[in-house]
């Protein structure tokens, strides 16, 4: 008799048992790409950060770590307003910088990043979150913040330099497009790494003047009631205090370095041109939209 694996009891009853059903497949686990997962993690960190750790103390620590590079014969006069960090998702650097700038305008009603993005998309200023037009950035700020904005053209020197420094010493933000190096600092790539930063403050190296000294860092000081006006400061060196959407940290950039970077934005990155995505680039390209352009913001009541 041929061998069988059937249950004898089932054979006697004349019943043939069906094989057990196959096990269900394991549930699919959808993993975010590493860059997206990292971005979302740092965005969460930024949203829950304590201003005391991201503000003055962090900036002072950075200045102290770089103190050996500064001219020890100068007094270092710091103007800065705390600005919260926000990590961008995708090419949202300009809109994230705008959101950060809005925090310095004492707005009656906060404008969430999503509101800013939706406004930019609906008006045809952006497709992916990119902003290749400083003029559109100035108009967008008026619409979402209800503030005043001023578009500067012709670079960061000359008359514009005075306007930028006056803005920063008044505690108001400046948005600057520039080419971003791998450490997020300004570089010169002819616009291939175009990026946006918000400038929240300025560090002057000055010869003399009456200022309030920092209790912890020799040579670092702050403006006082009897400090000389900006026009009367004997300024020898200038650094800008910056934040941008790829880092939680403040950065300190030489004025001339970011000025040179801002003034050579002329081409769209060829990799971006061929990546299959749609981007909104103004007539005249990156050169017409960003090169040598800066945006200043003020509350309407100023």
From Swiss-Prot:
Belongs to the ACTMAP family. GO terms for biological process: protein processing. The active site is at 93. It comes from the Eukaryota. The gene is actmap. Residues 1-26 are annotated as: Disordered. Transmembrane segments: none annotated. It is an enzyme of class 3 (hydrolase). Its EC number is 3.4.11.-. It is found in: Cytoplasm. Its main location: cytoplasm. Actin maturation protease that specifically mediates the cleavage of immature acetylated N-terminal actin, thereby contributing to actin maturation. Cleaves N-terminal acetylated methionine of immature cytoplasmic beta- and gamma-actin after translation. Cleaves N-terminal acetylated cysteine of muscle alpha-actin after canonical removal of N-terminal methionine. GO terms for molecular function: initiator methionyl aminopeptidase activity. Pfam families: ACTMAP-like_C. Residues 85-205 are annotated as: Peptidase C39-like. Keywords: Aminopeptidase, Cytoplasm, Hydrolase, Protease. This is Actin maturation protease. One of its GO terms (cellular component) is cytoplasm. It comes from Xenopus tropicalis.
């Amino acid at each position: 008799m041929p061998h069988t694996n059937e249950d004898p009891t089932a054979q006697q009853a004349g019943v043939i048992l069906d094989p057990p059903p196959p096990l269900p497949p394991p549930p699919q686990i959808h993993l975010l790409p590493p860059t997206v997962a990292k971005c979302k993690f740092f965005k969460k960190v930024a949203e829950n950060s304590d201003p005391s750790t991201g503000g003055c103390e962090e900036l002072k620590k950075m200045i102290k770590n770089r103190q050996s590079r500064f001219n020890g014969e100068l007094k270092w006069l710091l103007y800065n307003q705390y600005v919260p960090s926000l990590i961008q998702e995708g090419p949202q650097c300009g809109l994230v910088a705008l959101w950060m700038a809005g925090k310095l305008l004492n707005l009656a009603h906060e404008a969430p990043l999503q509101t800013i993005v939706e406004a930019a998309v609906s008006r045809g200023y952006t497709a992916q979150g990119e902003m290749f037009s400083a003029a559109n950035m100035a108009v967008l700020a008026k619409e979402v913040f209800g503030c005043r904005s001023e578009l500067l053209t012709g670079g960061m020197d000359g008359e514009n330099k005075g306007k930028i420094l006056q803005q920063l010493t008044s505690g108001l933000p400046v948005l600057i497009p520039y080419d971003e190096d791998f450490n997020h600092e300004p570089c010169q790539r002819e616009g291939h790494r175009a990026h946006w930063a918000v400038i929240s403050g300025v560090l002057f190296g000055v010869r003399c003047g009456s200022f309030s000294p920092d209790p912890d860092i020799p040579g670092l000081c702050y403006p006082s009631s009897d400090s000389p006006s900006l026009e009367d400061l004997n300024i020898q060196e200038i650094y800008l205090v910056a934040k941008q959407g790829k880092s939680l940290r403040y950065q300190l950039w030489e004025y001339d370095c970011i000025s040179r970077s801002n003034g050579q934005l002329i081409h769209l990155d060829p990799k971006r041109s061929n990546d299959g995505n749609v981007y909104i680039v103004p007539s005249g390209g990156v050169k017409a939209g960003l090169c040598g352009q800066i945006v200043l913001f003020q509350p309407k009541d100023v």
